Regions:
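Class I SAM-dependent transferase core
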Residues: 1-84, 92-95, 100, 113-127, ...
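Conserved nucleotide-cofactor-binding alpha/beta core module
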Residues: 72, 76-195
Length: 218
């Protein structure tokens, strides 16, 4: 399989028509090799518009390329920023975040997936991502505040404890709701308040242990 041609087709046939137009986002999708983070059994589907299974680990699946790209575009990260990811999975989103940011701390609840992600990141030469095992829905307050937080899985509502770990001007991307009605949202911290913007509708797998939690109240 010609992965470079498949990567080009993904960008030109899926992402640009879907209004992913930020040149920095499109560039990093060519630099970070998605196929290297996909389990070998599913590598031929690396650029398909689908959620790819990550083996037998609790049924976890990767976001589709379209959701990944829109999330990066919404966060609009800068090179100096400190980023937190909740739900490492294969490590691919962490690698994308790391290509845009100064440092990424990614928390994965499944030790098997955390090991997979560390191996994938090391093989890809990513050195500014740290993967920890734990329940990321509480965030990582010891290393807060963060310029950006990426929640790589659906939650019923974003826990306030995650929002509180944002810097002023910090952004948090998440997918809220329950199938079949989910909404990708971007929160921005403005002093002690939080602005919520609806980005798009989608359906993705929920984070493990993502039980209903206290959420941001307008």
């Amino acid at each position: 399989m010609n992965f470079e041609q498949a990567r080009f087709n993904m960008v030109e046939q899926q992402l640009r028509p879907g209004k992913v137009l930020n040149p920095d986002v499109l560039e990093v999708l060519f630099v970070v090799k998605r196929e290297e983070f996909v389990p070998p059994a599913h590598r031929r589907l690396a650029f398909a518009d689908t959620q790819i299974p990550l083996g037998e680990a609790d049924g976890a699946r990767m976001f589709s390329p379209r959701v990944e790209a829109h999330a990066l575009q919404a966060l609009a990260m800068k090179k100096h920023e400190n980023v937190l990811e909740i739900g490492t999975g294969s490590g691919y989103m962490a690698a994308l975040l790391g290509a845009h940011a100064d440092h990424v701390r990614s928390i994965e609840i499944d030790p098997q997936l955390a090991d997979m992600a560390r191996a994938n990141l090391a093989r890809a030469g990513v050195t500014n991502v740290v993967v920890e095992v734990g329940n990321g829905l509480a965030g990582s307050p010891a290393y807060a505040p963060y310029d950006a937080v990426m929640v790589s899985g659906a939650v019923p509502a974003v826990p306030q404890v995650l929002l509180d770990q944002l810097k002023p001007g910090g952004r948090l991307f998440a997918i809220e709701g329950a199938a079949p009605v989910m909404e990708a949202v971007l929160y921005t911290r403005v002093d002690q308040d939080f602005r919520r913007l609806s980005v798009f509708e989608t359906v993705v797998d929920s984070l493990r242990d993502a039980a209903p939690a206290p959420a941001f109240v307008f």
